[in-house]
Amino acid sequence: MVYSMDLMPIILASQSESRLRLLKKINIVPSQIIPANIDESSLPAELPKNLALRLAIQKADKIAQNIEDGYVIAADTVVAVGRRILPKTITDFDVEYCLKMLSGRRHRVFTGVKITKVKHNNIIAFNTRTVESIVKVKRLTPQEIATYVATKQGLNKAGGHSIEGMWECFIQFMRGSYSNIMGLPLFETRNMLFSLGFDCIRSNQ
């Protein structure tokens, strides 16, 4: 049972099914899902971790200004090889490009998170965090790349892949938060909510 010290609703500023599933793991079912629909383009010379946090902040701010009461959770995930930011894929060509960039290399996954507490149409508190995980992918064969592209699992994903599917069998090692790689670091998210007055673990019983 979710325990909130002020019983305000949770609003997820994302239509990501992965983030919704992750929140359910910590007993949170958002009252509303409101995608922010912002321009997610990077700025010139912007670092990957800065992009992830900037976009999360913009998403949270856009939704929070239209909320009467609640906690707005916004996140953005960026995949980078060195300082090269990989795209959020739209086409099979995008996925193939990302896989070739990731093949045989380490890459970093950054998720920026902002949680904003709104009461009586006023922002009364917020918390931000950026979490980094490191992943090493095996050297992929042309057949492995073609097979993964054909699954369509990499479409509409940061870096052209989803760790929840076939991609996991290509990973040699990971360091850091697994849920961060999926799109929402649960340890940090729970602590951020708690600092704002919401405990998703404590039971009323």
Curated annotation (Swiss-Prot):
Family statement drawn from the similarity comment of this UniProt entry: Belongs to the Maf family.
Example of a GO biological process term: nucleotide metabolic process
NCBIfam families xref list: maf (TIGR00172)
EC numbers on record: 3.6.1.9
Listed GO CC annotations: cytoplasm
Superkingdom field: Bacteria
Disulfide topology: none
Positions of the catalytic residues: 76 (proton acceptor)
Record key words, sorted: Cytoplasm, Hydrolase, Nucleotide metabolism
Swiss-Prot/TrEMBL cofactor(s): a divalent metal cation
Catalytic activity: a ribonucleoside 5'-triphosphate + H2O = a ribonucleoside 5'-phosphate + diphosphate + H(+); a 2'-deoxyribonucleoside 5'-triphosphate + H2O = a 2'-deoxyribonucleoside 5'-phosphate + diphosphate + H(+)
Protein name: Nucleoside triphosphate pyrophosphatase
GO MF assignments: nucleoside triphosphate diphosphatase activity
CDD domains per the UniProt record, alphabetical: Maf
Primary location class: cytoplasm
InterPro entries reported in the protein's UniProt record: ITPase-like_fam (IPR029001), Maf-like (IPR003697)
Biological function: Nucleoside triphosphate pyrophosphatase. May have a dual role in cell division arrest and in preventing the incorporation of modified nucleotides into cellular nucleic acids.
Subcellular location: Cytoplasm
